[in-house]
Each structure stands twice: as structure tokens, then as C-alpha cells.
Curated annotation (Swiss-Prot):
PANTHER family: ADENINE PHOSPHORIBOSYLTRANSFERASE (PTHR32315), URACIL PHOSPHORIBOSYLTRANSFERASE, CHLOROPLASTIC (PTHR32315:SF4). Allosterically activated by GTP. It holds the Pfam family UPRTase. Its EC number is 2.4.2.9. The gene is upp. Catalyzes the conversion of uracil and 5-phospho-alpha-D-ribose 1-diphosphate (PRPP) to UMP and diphosphate. 5-phospho-alpha-D-ribose 1-diphosphate binds at R78, R103, D130, P131, M132, L133, A134, T135, G136, G137, S138, D199. Binds 1 Mg(2+) ion per subunit. The magnesium is bound as Mg-PRPP. Uracil binds at I193, G198, D199, A200. GO terms for molecular function: GTP binding; magnesium ion binding; uracil phosphoribosyltransferase activity. One of its GO terms (biological process) is uracil salvage. This is Uracil phosphoribosyltransferase. Transmembrane segments: none annotated.
Length: 208
């Protein structure tokens, strides 16, 4: 599985700011979108382009345009919504496919509760966004769902990943690509990433 830890200075700086324990909801939300935007830039670097001729201000001009499959952004509810605008900033025409999954706090297993996917998933590149890759359960369940709908090109964008989650994701779906702003140390006994960001969903939405 292709794993890319984006080490650009801006990404490292912004993730560092997100780790502050007393960060405000407004600031955390802004940074989640900003880092999501930077991850999108990295994840789309291999998109193919084609040269087309358009009518410019002074006559015909050749320009490059992205070709191939169209994109669908797949936020995993609810926290994934915090990264979605960062993706749409670069790909405003992308379709939005929503997957609702929560983690059972007792078993740490993913529990699906909602889905609304683009009707032509087999023709699209899916960019899944979720702030945390902890155990990997929610991400694996989401990819299972997308593949059942015919999607064959999938990239996952996360703010922070745990080694345990990366290992689980690779075992389940070695054909996907993972882009993360940071690979952290480990999970604690409750399945939270250390040092992590805390509960990203609570911090993005300001609710518990």
C-alpha cells in the first residue's frame, strides 16, 4: 500500500497548532480544512492531464486540463466534514458521497448507520476524508462499501494516522493510497491516537 506522510513545512506547522490542548473550535475547524487542502494537493499530483485549445483573450491558446475519471469526495461522518471544504477548494466540481460510521466505544468496531453515494462510483476516483486513522475500522468499512459499488480508484486522506491503523488498512486494502499529515506513536488502551489531536469530531463541531 502506498503511504505518504506529507512533511511539507506548512503541513507540519499546522498539525502542530492542532495539537494544542486549549485550541478553539473555530481555529481547529479552520486548520482541519487547511490541512485537508494541502493533502489534496499531494494526493492529486499523479492526476493525468491533456492539452486542449481554448479561446483566450488574444486568440486560441493551448492549456492543460485534468482528464480521466472524475472525483467524488467521501467524508466519513461526522468529523470528515471538517476536511471536505479543503478538498472542494481544489476540485469544486467533485460529487459528494457521504458515509456515516461511528466507532463502538466498547468493542472499538465500526457501526455503519448512513450512506449516500454518487450513482456512478465505478467511473470516479474516491477521495475519502476522515481526520483520524486509529484502529482503521471505519476507513476499512468505508472502502468495503465503495468497492461494493464498483469504485476501483480510492485514496484516503487523514490528518493523523496510527501505525496500528495503517497496518490494518494495508492488510484489508493494499491497493488504496493513504495520505496523512502525521504518523503518530501508537494507540492507547481505548483506541485513541497518541499523541493525536483529541476527539477531532468534538473539536470541529464544538459538541460532545
Amino acid at each position: 500500500m502506498k503511504v505518504v506522510e506529507v512533511k511539507h513545512p506548512l503541513v507540519r506547522h499546522k498539525i502542530g497548532l492542532m495539537r494544542e490542548g486549549d485550541i478553539s473550535t473555530k481555529r481547529f475547524r479552520e486548520l482541519a480544512a487547511e490541512v485537508g487542502s494541502l493533502l489534496t494537493y499531494e494526493a492529486t499530483a499523479d492526476f493525468e492531464t491533456e492539452t486542449v485549445t481554448i479561446e483566450g483573450w488574444n486568440g486560441p491558446v493551448e492549456v492543460d486540463q485534468i482528464k480521466g475519471k472524475k472525483v467524488t469526495v467521501v467524508p466519513i461522518l461526522r468529523a470528515g466534514l471538517g476536511m471536505m471544504d479543503g478538498v472542494l477548494e481544489h476540485i469544486p466540481s467533485a460529487r459528494i458521497s457521504v458515509v456515516g460510521i461511528y466507532r463502538d466505544e466498547e468493542t472499538l468496531e465500526p457501526v455503519p448507520y448512513f450512506e449516500k453515494l454518487a450513482s456512478d462510483m465505478n467511473e470516479r476516483i474516491a477521495l475519502i476524508v476522515d481526520p483520524m486513522l486509529a484502529t482503521g475500522g471505519s476507513m476499512i468499512a468505508t472502502i468495503d462499501l465503495l468497492k461494493k459499488r464498483g469504485c476501483t480508484s480510492i485514496k484516503a486522506l487523514v490528518l493523523v494516522a496510527a501505525p496500528e491503523g495503517i497496518k490494518a488498512l494495508e492488510a484489508a486494502h493494499p491497493d488504496v493510497e493513504l495520505y496523512t499529515a502525521a504518523i503518530d506513536r501508537c494507540l492507547n488502551e481505548k483506541g485513541y491516537i497518541l499523541p493525536g489531536l483529541g476527539d477531532a469530531g468534538d473539536k470541529i463541531f464544538g459538541t460532545k
